[in-house]
Amino acid sequence: MSSSTHHWIARRGTALQGSLAIPGDKSVSHRAVMFAALADGVSQIDGFLEGEDTRSTAAIFAKLGVRIETPSASQRIVHGVGVDGLQPPTEALDCGNAGTGMRLLAGLLAAQRFDSVLVGDESLSKRPMRRVTGPLAQMGARIETQDDGTPPLHVHGGQALHGIDFVSPVASAQVKSAVLLAGLYAQGETSVTEPHPTRDYTERMLSAFGVEIDFSPGKARLRGGQRLRATDIAVPADFSSAAFFIVAASIVPGSEVVLRAVGLNPRRTGLLAALRLMGAEISEENHAEHGGEPVADLRVRYAPLRGAQIPEALVPDMIDEFPALFVAAAAASGQTVVTGAAELRVKESDRLAAMATGLRTLGVQVDETPDGATIHGGSIGSGVIESHGDHRIAMAFAIAGQLSTGQVQVNDVANVATSFPGFDTLAQGAGFGLETAGRR
């Protein structure tokens, strides 16, 4: 059965309750496998996200000659080969749906002595890659894209890279990370300056693997020729996955949930600030640090939300959470205004258009703009939603269904497994009204 017939029926359930274990952070899982593969020695990764995207990244490193053991679904033991130990692949390297994987690998593979080809699924094959290949070319890399700048990426090895001081025109952690990874192999120093600070997972984790790197919000610098030391990584729960339960508990009356050991990277948690601005009741407990990443338990209680102007300064820190925020805005009283979010148009789908269209289908008034939208809160009706194969759109409308006056059918939800395997089971256990139909 094709993924297009795999859908959810979402309707009002009960108040959400319980202490929930959210799967591991996707961004941290990608990087943990990559850096452990490049390290000298053996690294153990606990809390690894067993999703399609991260499995694709692990499979790519296996094709590059790295031995990776899987003692359990959430564990990986990586036998690092060192920065100069990767082997030429015998076939194209399939990144699946993972934009993070493809863009970071472009920076890494540009510095190798062998040629390689990076391919992806239908969605990834439409995403812009010149934002990465451009600065890598400035460093001496040779990477070919399609004529429109999309994958596949043909990476020509054997190039001598040199460090650059790159002033990025886009606020993108993936672009920054690709340049920094190439910089590990480059002659001299490489620096990246961003228009707005982005997530610093790469910088924090490189430091955890023993790389000397200077970084502060919006800036990072390292010198080439360094080696990585194996280290064990405990991956925190993925904040972007937790976001759907944060919003659901905030809008479903009577709800109270605890989300355990959630990653709270300060460049990732703009949604918390936005929801608190709207009146959400979210507290942080049991602060700790895992692999350089701050974590805490999040306690979320239902609270009536009110519309707000979302500060543009928060946008880069919540770029993956906007589908969830749009549902919170639909449930709030008054208007919520989002600006400065044009980046949403080049994610796994055009998320601005997909969310605006979907909410209108459910009777919510949404005024779309080139870089955002105004959402008029009110009643959420029933209807059939097309997720466009986008995992975050699908999960957002599963939440919307919890306040529906009828039911919401969400089509094409198989891709949820890329970031949140078991979402439907966890949601049902917490109190969601959610049925899965037409499994593949």
Curated annotation (Swiss-Prot):
InterPro entries linked to this entry: Enolpyruvate_Tfrase_dom, Enolpyruvate_Tfrase_sf, EPSP_synthase, EPSP_synthase_CS, RNA3'P_cycl/enolpyr_Trfase_a/b
Binding residue positions for 3-phosphoshikimate: K26, S27, R31, S172, Q174, D320, K347
Alphabetical keyword list: Amino-acid biosynthesis, Aromatic amino acid biosynthesis, Cytoplasm, Transferase
Presence of keyword Kinase: no
Pfam (any one): EPSP_synthase
Residue sites binding phosphoenolpyruvate per the record: K26, G99, R127, Q174, R351, R392
GO CC entries: cytoplasm
Functional summary from the UniProt entry: Catalyzes the transfer of the enolpyruvyl moiety of phosphoenolpyruvate (PEP) to the 5-hydroxyl of shikimate-3-phosphate (S3P) to produce enolpyruvyl shikimate-3-phosphate and inorganic phosphate.
Assembly behavior: Monomer.
Entry similarity comment: Belongs to the EPSP synthase family.
Protein name: 3-phosphoshikimate 1-carboxyvinyltransferase
Organism: Xanthomonas euvesicatoria pv. vesicatoria (strain 85-10) (Xanthomonas campestris pv. vesicatoria)
